[in-house]
From Swiss-Prot:
The keyword RNA-binding applies. Binds as a heterodimer with protein bS6 to the central domain of the 16S rRNA, where it helps stabilize the platform of the 30S subunit. Belongs to the bacterial ribosomal protein bS18 family. It comes from Roseobacter denitrificans (strain ATCC 33942 / OCh 114). The keyword rRNA-binding applies. Part of the 30S ribosomal subunit. Forms a tight heterodimer with protein bS6. This is Small ribosomal subunit protein bS18. GO terms for biological process: translation.
Amino acid sequence: MASKPFFRRRKVCPFSGDNAPKIDYKDTRLLQRYISERGKIVPSRITAVSAKKQRELARAIKRARFLALLPYAVK
Protein backbone atom coordinates (compact mmCIF):
# COMPACT_ATOMS: atom_id res chain seq x y z
CA MET A 1 0.00 0.00 0.00
CA ALA A 2 1.57 3.25 -1.12
CA SER A 3 0.69 6.19 1.08
CA LYS A 4 0.40 9.75 -0.15
CA PRO A 5 3.56 11.78 0.38
CA PHE A 6 3.28 14.35 3.16
CA PHE A 7 3.55 17.97 2.03
CA ARG A 8 4.20 20.64 4.60
CA ARG A 9 1.78 23.55 4.24
CA ARG A 10 3.49 26.72 3.01
CA LYS A 11 3.25 29.48 5.60
CA VAL A 12 1.88 32.83 4.48
CA CYS A 13 3.90 35.99 5.04
CA PRO A 14 2.58 37.79 8.15
CA PHE A 15 3.22 41.19 6.52
CA SER A 16 1.15 40.54 3.37
CA GLY A 17 -2.56 41.09 3.24
CA ASP A 18 -5.02 43.87 3.91
CA ASN A 19 -4.78 44.25 7.69
CA ALA A 20 -1.11 43.30 7.97
CA PRO A 21 1.08 45.35 10.33
CA LYS A 22 3.43 47.93 8.85
CA ILE A 23 7.14 47.42 9.46
CA ASP A 24 8.34 50.44 11.44
CA TYR A 25 11.62 50.81 13.31
CA LYS A 26 9.79 52.51 16.22
CA ASP A 27 7.50 49.49 16.76
CA THR A 28 9.85 47.54 19.03
CA ARG A 29 7.18 45.07 20.19
CA LEU A 30 6.67 43.89 16.59
CA LEU A 31 10.40 43.81 15.82
CA GLN A 32 11.24 41.77 18.92
CA ARG A 33 9.14 38.89 17.60
CA TYR A 34 11.69 38.56 14.77
CA ILE A 35 14.79 38.67 16.98
CA SER A 36 16.17 35.61 18.79
CA GLU A 37 16.76 35.58 22.54
CA ARG A 38 20.44 36.31 21.80
CA GLY A 39 19.48 39.40 19.78
CA LYS A 40 20.05 38.01 16.27
CA ILE A 41 17.62 38.48 13.38
CA VAL A 42 15.64 35.25 12.83
CA PRO A 43 15.86 33.93 9.22
CA SER A 44 12.83 34.09 6.94
CA ARG A 45 12.65 30.30 6.50
CA ILE A 46 11.71 30.09 10.18
CA THR A 47 9.42 33.15 10.37
CA ALA A 48 7.86 32.64 6.87
CA VAL A 49 8.41 36.31 5.96
CA SER A 50 8.76 37.00 2.22
CA ALA A 51 12.18 38.05 0.89
CA LYS A 52 11.14 41.66 0.28
CA LYS A 53 9.59 42.03 3.73
CA GLN A 54 12.59 40.27 5.36
CA ARG A 55 14.88 42.95 3.90
CA GLU A 56 12.54 45.67 5.21
CA LEU A 57 12.43 43.94 8.59
CA ALA A 58 16.23 43.66 8.79
CA ARG A 59 16.60 47.33 7.85
CA ALA A 60 14.08 48.35 10.54
CA ILE A 61 15.80 46.19 13.19
CA LYS A 62 19.22 47.63 12.33
CA ARG A 63 17.81 51.16 12.44
CA ALA A 64 16.20 50.49 15.84
CA ARG A 65 19.49 49.08 17.14
CA PHE A 66 21.38 52.17 15.95
CA LEU A 67 18.90 54.42 17.79
CA ALA A 68 19.22 52.24 20.94
CA LEU A 69 15.58 51.09 20.78
CA LEU A 70 16.74 47.46 20.51
CA PRO A 71 19.92 45.82 21.86
CA TYR A 72 22.67 44.61 19.53
CA ALA A 73 23.30 41.55 21.69
CA VAL A 74 21.71 40.06 24.80
CA LYS A 75 23.91 38.42 27.42
